[in-house]
């Protein structure tokens, strides 16, 4: 989708707040009559023909920088005050009401601000209106000031307007954002919401549950037990979680539904700060090694890594790649990721157009000296030649081969070959690490033919292998693993699952050389990211997926041993990953993946192979294999049309402490967990002495998992 840079409006007003000038700022040559700015001009200010100015206010400016810019824009040499009818800019009141310099106020209540425009005006990417008044025309002239314009800002803006017609702003945005808010709903608000769901009869599955120390009181038509004392969960018609709240916080995935449900509730909302990551795909590649040729600290701060930028307030980080940009922000600002992408694309057009690689003798020598170097017995550094030998076979447009030598020709026409005096390192290949990171084809000399390598295919045959090839470098556990990466397991599971297995790594780094089989972590297959935020989410996922899931030091199983599949999943930063066995030969970069040895964990399942009755009453029988009514297994979904109450038995802390970890390795379907809770109550009813708790449980569940681990 093509990103449209929104117009901006600057209004200069006189003593009576009458509009003296209305400047419509846009990088385009016309007025967008569908824009909110034009609607505001026409409908609220009754201005049909503003001044069209081909300029643009950078949303990254501080208030003092903005003030200097506006003075230059309007050609005002006097002290000015800037303000807005939507947000507080330069000044604000202590109660955060909107500041207006023409309204009488107690001056001691004014607070001065020099923050960044996009922070104080969160909607600025889509709708920016700034009012400017001469200080002498307002009721507080002493609060006005004059700021000199930063000439670098004007220089940058001029260059921006020059390159703007050339920019390809066709982008696609993926986001993983923080949608959790603090709220004042409490139990009363949650009851109103669940009542409204039922009154509207919208067929959304819902659950309002309230638990005491040992669990349960519940209503709703979707039963999932979690570890929060109070929880409201509502699911969309397609089964995805629309919203979840414990009364103090709320996670919102369906904004429209939530808005409809709380329309008659006085709801206070405050977004909980947390990182939001946007991945912006570019239709036209950029140069990821950005270099700024003028002062641009009013937009970005350059870092030691030339493909990473920081915003001026250091709260937004931008990672550049050839075909996409990753933007991480601390809090949600509407469309800020598109705006920063626009600035990055513009800067690339100004200073960093995609260039051909320079000669290796001028730039890449540093890489040769570090990685592809000559030693006493190894001659790995290629040499430059001026011509091809007669009779050499053309392999591709940039690679030739004969019985004696191989020649690679780079984008600048420089010819490289390998001529080892010892006759060993005569095969031309390429350094993987720099190709993986920056797509640089840096030649090096090898013992064996390299044509089977993925990097060779990319550099010589221009075959895009980015998504097909997995890097042999193994990351430390804890980071989200992308499609082309893999990581180690946590130490405890690495030792457990890889007992007796080995992986040979290259010396001094974590690059896999060879293994006949080793458990690692990969991203899950497919394009959909599965995110599990709460225990309820984990239970539902394990129940539906019917595979083992590792969360921290916990192992979650489906309820019945017969349901356990052959996959092992693991949760990293709330994202579901997959545990697999990796195999690799030393002679090849090809990495093969195989299913894990799931039986190692499955054997920990606290199973009971023979159905054993635990308690029975009035035709209801609780067994180790489920709950039966009149001899039939109870497997009906619970309905919101009924209310179920379980009166929990009050037990001593000692009893509760012993019961708590005993079901650590078993996570069940919702109704089964309901039964499990009832079973615990029954066992307490059975007056089990704390000293006999474990023997009593092992009577019904001989393979408790606890004994095996110990």
UniProtKB/Swiss-Prot annotation:
One of its GO terms (biological process) is positive regulation of DNA-templated transcription. It is found in: Virion. InterPro entries: Poxvirus_early-TF_lsu (IPR007532). The keyword RNA-binding does not apply. Its main location: virion. Acts with RNA polymerase to initiate transcription from early gene promoters. Is recruited by the RPO-associated protein of 94 kDa RAP94/OPG109 to form the early transcription complex, which also contains the core RNA polymerase. ETF heterodimer binds to early gene promoters. Belongs to the poxviridae VETF large subunit family. This is Early transcription factor 82 kDa subunit. The lineage of its organism: Viruses, Varidnaviria, Bamfordvirae, Nucleocytoviricota, Pokkesviricetes.
